[in-house]
Design a protein with these regions (language model features):
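Short active-site oxyanion
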Residues: 133-138, 199-202
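Terminal peptide-recognition signature
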Residues: 7, 58, 141, 149, ...
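Conserved mixed alpha/beta catalytic, RNA-binding, or beta-rich assembly cores of soluble enzyme
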Residues: 139-142, 166-168
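TOPRIM fold recognition
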Residues: 151-261
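Non-catalytic accessory segments of DNA primases and related replication-initiation nucleases
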Residues: 1-60, 260
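Short active-site loop/helix that positions an aromatic residue
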Residues: 9, 146, 150-154
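Basic, glycine-enriched DNA-binding surface that flanks or lies within the catalytic cores of DNA
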Residues: 35-131
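Helix N-cap/beta->alpha junction signal
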Residues: 141-144, 207
Length: 261
């Protein structure tokens, strides 16, 4: 790269200023430091007066009323305005909301709106608390997977169910170079720091390449300190949200009366 091109493309100088500098017709150029962007403050989306729409949506996805009501009662799930998104709330140890994941209830071509609320801290991700003291935490890639697995387990409240807010994994068959793929999830690290009573980690990531990769990395990192239980969905390529929805549809077909011929 030429000196002129370097000054223009890297230092951001104007062409004329760069030429003058190289010809020693102007004083040395000192690039200005860009100001650090301040992180916007976190604020929960406004609540709607009820949760009727998100309850219907989650029911359709195979999530039981019992599980939905449990989450609403713990103030970690509600319906927002004006778009009626399902809001999954993550809290810190003082029960202060520090994270929110929004999931749209209207889908187009099988895809719906999903985003983390501005200012969210992923280390305080969505977590369903147990009914009583426990030594186990189950970890999932997404909030809805936690609700789905709880539904499939008949609404058991015997462990924490923590969403990791997504996972970092390389593409299949890619050469692994970045250490970021091997870093333990922030949400799980923060949770374990604040819950020294935990002795067991149940890994419930998706049964695809990324989920299996994440499972192996967590297993390597925590094995020896914690008892590791690997509990991925039995179906290849599926997550627990898929299985809950499939079970809902299967039950619907089973309960449908036979048509007369």
């Amino acid at each position: 790269m030429s000196a002129l091109r370097f000054l223009i493309e890297v230092d951001g100088m104007k062409f004329t200023d760069a030429v003058k500098l190289l010809c020693e017709e102007s004083p040395s150029f000192i690039p200005t430091q860009s100001a650090k962007k301040e992180k916007p403050p976190f604020k929960l989306p406004e609540r709607y007066c009820n949760c009727r729409r998100i309850r219907a949506y989650l029911n359709h996805r195979g999530i039981s009323d019992e599980v939905i009501t449990y989450c609403i009662s713990h103030e970690i799930l509600y319906e927002s305005v004006p778009y009626h998104n399902a809001v999954f709330v993550g809290k810190d140890e003082s029960r202060k909301a520090r994270y929110a994941f929004l999931r749209g209830i209207y889908e187009k071509n099988g895809k719906g709106f999903k985003m983390e609320q501005t200012g969210s801290e992923k280390k305080y991700s969505f977590c369903i608390p147990p009914e009583r003291e426990t030594k186990r935490v189950a970890v999932y890639e997404a909030c809805i997977d936690a609700l789905a697995h709880m539904t499939l387990e008949e609404g058991k409240r015997d462990k924490y169910r923590l969403s990791l807010g997504g996972i970092a994994a390389p593409k299949e068959n890619a050469l692994i170079q970045s250490e970021r793929f091997k870093k333990p999830p922030d949400a799980l690290e923060e949770f374990l720091k604040n819950h020294p009573e935990i002795k067991e980690i149940e890994i419930c990531t998706d049964n695809d390449f990324a989920g299996r990769w994440a499972k192996e990395q967590m297993k390597k990192h925590y094995e020896g300190t914690y008892q590791i239980i690997c509990n991925l969905p039995e179906k290849e390529g599926a997550d627990y949200a898929d299985l809950a929805k499939e079970k809902k549809q299967a039950n619907k077909c089973r309960d449908r009366p036979l048509e007369r011929r």
